[in-house]
């Protein structure tokens, strides 16, 4: 540890921002609504993902070992998502986010039907994993673009909201399971995803001019 401290060069943080940056960030509607979108979309994902294993076992009547294998597919889908993000995001950032959210919504909507066969479940989980992984990567990149002068503060807020979305998703999933049934978690997540999708589209169309002015 001592050698690391002595040998590594000093790399001061640039455009990190501080608490004083909060009023400035609060004046950027695209950024604020992106935070709202993040909370809702991540909640949508974890509404279903938190309960995916009992869903596959109790609703899909799948073998527990198979259910565990399905979860591993999420890890492999993350690799594919990283490659897709690196290749396509820079070409059309907004369209990339829209497509990623669409993948998430349709995956959740078709979750119940995918339990019919092993192939359909593996395929859907892989697509679902690509969708949510691309969402996480692209929304974080979007935050950096919208707050280039206070990146540390903006990303810290994003991380906090992301984690809040995880907790909220688990709560929504529990409520859906308790009052609607375990088989409804996909539909509940899809409904939340649709809300986040609509918010993202409408706020982007309404406030995109503020981003152009900000970067002049």
What is each PLM-predicted segment?
Residues 145-184, 188-192:
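A late C-terminal transmembrane helix in Major Facilitator Superfamily
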Residues 29-72, 76, 93:
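Extracytoplasmic gate region of multi-pass secondary transporters
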Residues 75-83, 166-167:
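Residue-level signature of mid-helix packing/kink "hotspots" within the transmembrane helices
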Residues 94-139:
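C-terminal transmembrane helical hairpin of 12-TM major facilitator-type secondary transporters
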Residues 1-14, 199-203:
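C-terminal membrane-cytosol helix-exit motif in multi-pass small-molecule transporters
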Residues 145, 202-216:
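Intrinsic disorder in cytosolic terminal tails and internal cytosolic loops
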Residues 80-93, 177:
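Helix-to-loop junctions at the C-terminal end of transmembrane segments
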Residues 62-71, 117, 121, 151-155:
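Juxtamembrane helix-start elements in MFS-like secondary transporters
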């Amino acid at each position: 540890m001592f050698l690391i401290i002595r040998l590594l060069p000093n790399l001061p943080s640039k455009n990190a921002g501080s608490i004083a940056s909060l009023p400035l960030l609060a004046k950027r509607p695209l950024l604020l609504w992106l935070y709202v979108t993040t909370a809702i979309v991540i909640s949508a994902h974890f509404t279903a993902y938190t309960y995916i294993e009992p869903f596959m076992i109790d609703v899909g009547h799948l073998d527990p070992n198979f259910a565990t294998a399905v979860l591993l597919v999420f890890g492999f889908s993350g690799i594919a998502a990283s490659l897709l993000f690196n290749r396509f995001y820079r070409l059309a950032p907004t369209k990339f986010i829209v497509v990623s959210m669409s993948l998430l919504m349709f995956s959740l909507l078709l979750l119940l039907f995918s339990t019919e066969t092993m192939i359909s479940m593996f395929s859907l989980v892989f697509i679902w994993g690509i969708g949510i992984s691309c969402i996480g990567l692209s929304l974080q990149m979007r935050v950096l673009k919208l707050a280039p002068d206070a990146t540390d503060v903006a990303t810290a807020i994003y991380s906090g909201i992301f984690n809040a979305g995880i907790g909220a998703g688990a709560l929504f999933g529990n409520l859906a399971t308790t009052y609607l049934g375990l088989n409804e978690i996909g539909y509940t997540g899809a409904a939340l995803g649709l809300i986040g999708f609509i918010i993202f589209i409408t706020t982007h169309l309404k406030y995109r001019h503020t981003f152009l002015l900000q970067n002049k």
